[in-house]
Amino acid sequence: MPELKVSAIKEGTVIDHIPAGKGLKVIEILGLSKLSNGGSVLLAMNVPSKKLGRKDIVKVEGKFLSEEEVNKIALVAPTATVNIIRNYKVVEKFKVEVPEVIEGILKCGNPNCITNYEYVTTKFYVISKNPLKVRCHYCERTMEEEEILANL
């Protein structure tokens, strides 16, 4: 397999094993195009992968992800792995996992849901992880992957 030539980062996060074509969505939902710390963001798309065939990789310099951000990644790229980098070394590595309950990340697709016109934190229960399907706590609307991605 040909070698992938991408420079290492000193401090930050590498999001690996993103399904091919989903890297831009990961950058978008994490707001990485608006980094205020001056760190760089690198997106490698459609690179060879033994596990996935093809994958995307996102490297973020100078940023460490919160639990909420990791949960957002799980909704878009459930196969992703997050690597925490300090002094050019991986100090922590974990797979993202879709939580059983999703709070405050997702908007409900039902225009009549109370969360769309009152100041109420959204809450969804995961019905299925593959394919991804969630149900709103308030109006009980069920949303599938395409609608979930549109409402992140």
Swiss-Prot record:
Gene3D superfamilies: Aspartate carbamoyltransferase regulatory subunit, C-terminal domain, Aspartate carbamoyltransferase regulatory subunit, N-terminal domain
InterPro entries reported in the protein's UniProt record: Asp_carbamoyltransf_reg_N, Asp_carbamoylTrfase_reg, Asp_carbamoyltrfase_reg_C, Asp_carbatrfase_reg_C_sf, Asp_carbatrfase_reg_N_sf
Gene Ontology CC, one term: aspartate carbamoyltransferase complex
Domain of life: Archaea
UniProt key word Disulfide bond: no
Chain positions recorded as Zn(2+) binding sites: 108, 113, 136, 139
Cofactor: Zn(2+)
Sample GO molecular function, one term: metal ion binding
Co-factor note (free text): Binds 1 zinc ion per subunit.
Keywords annotated in UniProt: Metal-binding, Pyrimidine biosynthesis, Zinc
GO biological process: 'de novo' pyrimidine nucleobase biosynthetic process; pyrimidine nucleotide biosynthetic process
Family: Belongs to the PyrI family.
Protein function: Involved in allosteric regulation of aspartate carbamoyltransferase.
Subunit structure: Contains catalytic and regulatory chains.
Protein's name in the database: Aspartate carbamoyltransferase regulatory chain
Annotated organism of origin: Pyrococcus horikoshii (strain ATCC 700860 / DSM 12428 / JCM 9974 / NBRC 100139 / OT-3)
Gene: pyrI
